[in-house]
Amino acid sequence: MHLIDSLETRTDWSKIFGVVDSLYNDKGFSSNADNFARATAVEKAIAKFSDLIRVDQTGYDFTFGDKKIELKMGKNLFYKRKDIHATKKFKVKSFLSEKKTVEDFRQSKTFDYMMVIDLTARRVVIVEDEHARSLYQTGADGAMIELKLGDYYECDLGGIITTTEPPTCLSDAINKAIEGYLNF
């Protein structure tokens, strides 16, 4: 089975986007410091409710068979009016810890597919590695990308998604775990 077929037919997007809704409506997550916990929870939800295996390696986040998948996600990635088939620029690689240029990143294959998820519009698109790398642009502190119609395959998620949220807030569970951890 191909990655796209699996994402379209064997992935429970109602639960994945339910996790997203729960995390972004969680009043206990209010600062940028919470972004890591949110991103990790979404990655783990994708792994639990799809055929992808979360590996969290440098340059890719999942595997699907022998294919490496890099995940990029964010709110409001696709334009709502200007061009609904185009994304705003978003960061794909960071220069902060490395002395690399955009050209270095264009030459370096680390994944087979980039999976881009717009958390607000509930859209999932797949970009092949070689094409993605050809679109890298220089940003303030890393390589950026901007996608247009023809740059990606958009997964058919079956129309309007009715979400199923987890029964508890993750921030509450984390706080209880920390309290228990410190109870010695």
Regions found by a protein language model. Give the residues of each.
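Nucleic-acid endonuclease domains
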Residues: 1-184
